[in-house]
Swiss-Prot record:
Record flagged with keyword Nucleus: yes
Name this polypeptide is given: L-pipecolate oxidase
GO cellular component: cytosol; extracellular region; nucleus
Protein's gene: fap1
Compartments, as annotated in UniProt: Secreted; Cytoplasm; Nucleus
A Pfam family per the record: DAO
An annotated GO BP: L-lysine catabolic process
Requisite cofactors: FAD
Keywords carried by this UniProt record: Cytoplasm, FAD, Flavoprotein, Glycoprotein, Nucleus, Oxidoreductase, Secreted, Signal
Matching Gene3D superfamilies: D-Amino Acid Oxidase, subunit A, domain 2 (3.30.9.10), FAD/NAD(P)-binding domain (3.50.50.60)
Main location: secreted
Domain of life from the UniProt record: Eukaryota
Assembly with partners or alone: Dimer.
Catalytic function, reaction form: L-pipecolate + O2 = L-1-piperideine-6-carboxylate + H2O2 + H(+)
Amino acid sequence: MVKNTSVIIVGAGVFGLSAALELTKRGGYTIKILDRAPPPVIDGSSVDANRIIRSDYADAVYCSMGIDALEEWRTNPLFKEQFYGSGLMFVGRDNVEYRDMSLENLTKMGVSAAKFQTTEELRKLFPKWIGELNDGEAGYANFSSGWANAEQSVKSVVNYLAHAGVSFISGPEGTVEELITEENVVKGVRTTTGAYMAEKLIFATGAWTASLLPNDHTRFLATGQPVAYIKLTPEEYIRFLTNPVYLDFDTGFYIFPPTPDGYLKFARHGYGFTRMQNLKSGKVESVPPKKPLVSPILPKEAELDLRRNLQRTYGEEISQRPFYKTRICYYTDTADAEFVFDYHPDYENLFVCTGGSGHGFKFFPILGKYSIGCMFRELEEPLLKKWRWKKENLEFAALDHSRAGPSRQELS
């Protein structure tokens, strides 16, 4: 009887779960997933009411991946119940290069989209939309895109993996404190209460990556993005139910159609907020809070910006309503917004699977195919190069043309 290869995955978010999903499909692995909390992890970036599912990318690789992922969202039993095909409205005036390149890629790949240049043209596509375009703004609608219930999607995959024999270890037993190493080989991980050994280790630790990895050479930066929710009346819910996802890359503001339980969620995809901390290792890194905050008070600038954009899209009355809930959602940023699927340069068997940079969730159904493909060096060289561990000193977010809004700020 052939012995299974033992694998430890640190991190029970989308990157870790998708890697486990791919390894489970391949067979021959005994998998343990460690996290300080059971999934869906309450403060993970992959856990929330909704996430945008789109193929709209100025990067042709991600555009193609998005089209493939959308097909899985529509048809795969693990995901299709969580997908809402609302369509997406892509608006811009200043950041037109990203918008226009996205539309060009979609067209080349056979995805139809409807362009609009005036509010009247927009409302022919979405009759219930009450927002106005600013002077010079234009955009397009992609009716194949939409959104997904992120939390329920995670639950669906966790249940599947558990039934397939994957072990989930959480609490102090799953809280990783350090690596167990022997020269340039990682033998296992030490947790708060014990240790786990394995032949292969995958670090999919999201916004905690820089604080957990030794000598990470500042490849990753945790940035917090402001998120808020407002409760709609039953009449408003019915009125706005057929609205699309709205995405404005001039401001970074985006907003979803109402959730089935009647909430509007909106946020900013920007340069974010850092939370620099002195770590026991001597490093200074941006790190999310150890204990998740329930409805944290948003920075005043962020609240005003969210309300200003909410007023533009959903009207004055709704924009002045008290927030039902708020959140700081922590991204794992890389300098160029590329994922990192590669071995740590100091350890030959430590595979790092992270760097979502605010756009990883949509690929949940197919992400493991690419991350594990990189782990086994099965992908074509351009993809291996795209997602390699980059040693160049690049300025964070300087190469991510999807970001907008104020410069990065430190949380006070």
